[in-house]
Amino acid sequence: MATPVRDETRNVIDDNISARIQSKVKTNDTVRQTPSSLRKVSIKDEQVKQYQRNLNRFKTILNGLKAEEEKLSETDDIQMLAEKLLKLGETIDKVENRIVDLVEKIQLLETNENNNILHEHIDATGTYYLFDTLTSTNKRFYPKDCVFDYRTNNVENIPILLNNFKKFIKKYQFDDVFENDIIEIDPRENEILCKIIKEGLGESLDIMNTNTTDIFRIIDGLKNKYRSLHGRDVRIRAWEKVLVDTTCRNSALLMNKLQKLVLMEKWIFSKCCQDCPNLKDYLQEAIMGTLHESLRNSVKQRLYNIPHNVGINHEEFLINTVIETVIDLSPIADDQIENSCMYCKSVFHCSINCKKKPNRELRPDSTNFSKTYYLQGAQRQQQLKSSAKRTKVLEQDTKKVKQSVQQQKTGNY
């Protein structure tokens, strides 16, 4: 029997070649026994039917290969036998690769069908959503009663929304859709992520593409909307409004403010720029620029003495260092210290360091802080006057006593 040509042998499937390949074509009998799965099999895609027809056709070709192998084993020509066995070995390797590829395609289609059946069943009766991820072979579960707890109607809070969304999907082990190398995810996972992020969008927040079912388009729409309203000049003014000195009395509010400014900058840049060293240096310079000179040196000293924890971002480490320094240097609660700046109402610095302070000497009663010390000085001056008056009266009384004693001595003489 003539040896099949190369193009034919590439499509040959031999279900007797190896037990490993035979095991892959077995189907899940348990799933096929269910009524729902039977309905799915009855309307199986035409591509699967074509795969099955190819399997039957390949068996016929395989019989010819077996007959060829038997004839080779009966010949006395050792050299010819070796050459043809070598060619058959190469053909078998190609056939095995083709078999593995074909079987994987069949299994993938059947797995998708079984997953759809399972998803429909869980959606109807279960308490969670089932989905697949690119980063794990195990299925993930997202509780139906879980709600994304951040909601905003303000475009200025889009960076906070995206940052909280990133933390939220990491908690429930979704694929990180903010990574550069992830450009497509499982449709089921995409559907759930769209549901989650839309829970955080208020009705009055007019953002393009929020009605789409593509999570990547929603994220890009949010970022583009934010960029259009927050150019470089707007961001620079936002940094310049913040000034922190050693009198800061609300460290929690300060942390939220600095975090918001950092997120404002990070979400302006593309994915590839967010881990760029230049961005790290830029953010460090911006954060240090918010510190008054009375606080800046202490923060620099602390940064020098404390090594950076590689487990957190550089800007997060820098903000934590600023907050720790502020807490250590913040004044003890006292009625004599003003609660907020009289010029800009900020709780991060005192009036004397404010950028809006006019270039003139403050009147004694212009602020509570100055007025207190003015009153204390007036009281001290009054005390000194009273003391001087008592001393003068005492001197006059002493003089009168001396004169009286002198008169008595003169009379005796």
UniProtKB/Swiss-Prot annotation:
UniProt biased composition (Low complexity): 403-413
Chain intervals for the UniProt region annotation (Disordered): 380-413
Keywords: Coiled coil, Transposable element
Claim: Coiled coil is one of the keywords in the record: yes
One record GO biological process: viral translational frameshifting
Coiled-coil regions listed in the entry: 39-115
Function as written in the Swiss-Prot or TrEMBL entry: Capsid protein (CA) is the structural component of the virus-like particle (VLP), forming the shell that encapsulates the retrotransposons dimeric RNA genome.
Note: Retrotransposons are mobile genetic entities that are able to replicate via an RNA intermediate and a reverse transcription step. In contrast to retroviruses, retrotransposons are non-infectious, lack an envelope and remain intracellular. Ty4 retrotransposons belong to the copia elements (pseudoviridae).
Name of this protein: Transposon Ty4-H Gag polyprotein
Organism: Saccharomyces cerevisiae (strain ATCC 204508 / S288c)
Gene that encodes the chain: TY4A-H
